[in-house]
Amino acid sequence: MEIKIHRGLDQIGGCITEICTDSSRVFIDFGQNQPSNGKAATPEEDTLMVADIIRNNEKEHQAVFYTHAHEDHVGLFRYILLEQYIGEGSKELLLIKYRTLLERYEMAIDENHQLQEGSKENEELQEENYRTTKDLIDKLKAFKTWKRTALKESPSPITIGDIRVTPFFTCHSIYDAHMFLVEADGKRIWHTGDYRQHGYMGKALFPMLRRYATNIDVLITEGTMLKRKDKCIHECEVSRKMESVMQAFKYVFVLASATDIERLASIKVAAETANKPLCILSLFMKRTMEFFTERQSSLSRGLFSFAPLFYTDKLYRKLKRRGFAMVVGTSQTDRIKELLDKLPQEETLLIYSSWDGYYKNAEQVKANSKYKEFREMFHNVVDIHTSGHADKATIRKVIETVCPKEVICIHKEAGASL
């Protein structure tokens, strides 16, 4: 068995790991590079890079496995012709995302046709976006999946030639993340993907490792937080901090990810405790919340059950009187601006609940200035966030628990070490 880290030893995100035998090979993640990893590649450059990696060292049996649905882990799927595997929940999240985008492009095309005076160039761009997104949906539909294993049940391995890959559910800042046990040639590799212990679902991390991550030859672990001094508070503490500031302001906006089930739960609990109606105005967030509720409500004793108000202008007067907690994303900037113009700024707060690098890091801002611009719309802003990644103490404990013969650290900044 051989391991090759194509990308990830000295960068966060964009990871590509290859594990092979004489007759078979699997890739774990084919992630899109993040802005902090240098100049963004063009689609043509990504196509060539993926083709070169796959063409070199081809085997009779081959497949790609994805740990979760963040773009820096799954973003290059569009260029891959091999069989691709992902968790059932992750596949559904990606389909929700691209189907919602497809509807948006469809509406834009219809509006252009109705106006009959829109620019030809813009119309062609929207039609190209529509075709591309439709192709991505078709490609995603072909993904093979595994179902998350019920508590107290052992997950089933997936066989690719003489390699066995077994997925294990883990806690991360997106729904349906997994670790992998890869077995072949009498060797056992444990690939962690992205993980943490300080989320609601993180308590299962070490019981799982003690039970399944035994006799491991090589541990491949993420190291995102190795050079960072951020304190990783628990999601419960995130919720308590949010509840406290929600008590102090009448109108509260919370900038958070629509795919982070645990953060959405923290916001929901904070809003309930502060006696504020939970609102959203994103169709994508509405659909992810419905999906989470359908899949996880009963399993979580209601923690992951969501029933937000979908904001419309008809609700404005009622919410103006009562106040609200509204979960938002940067794609809703224009609608938020309209609403902010109607609200007293001294009673309005933004809880920024995302990584602060999106507005502090110059490379990130250059690549996507929306987070910084979104913050600047508000007079009152407070950061309440915790990482989706394991802190140094958790990484150390994982290594001590697994006790592998060798450790490879990926998904880490250049110069970071164990």
Regions found by a protein language model. Name each.
Residues 1-65, 70-262, 266-273, 277-281, ...:
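His/Asp/Glu-rich metal-coordinating catalytic cores
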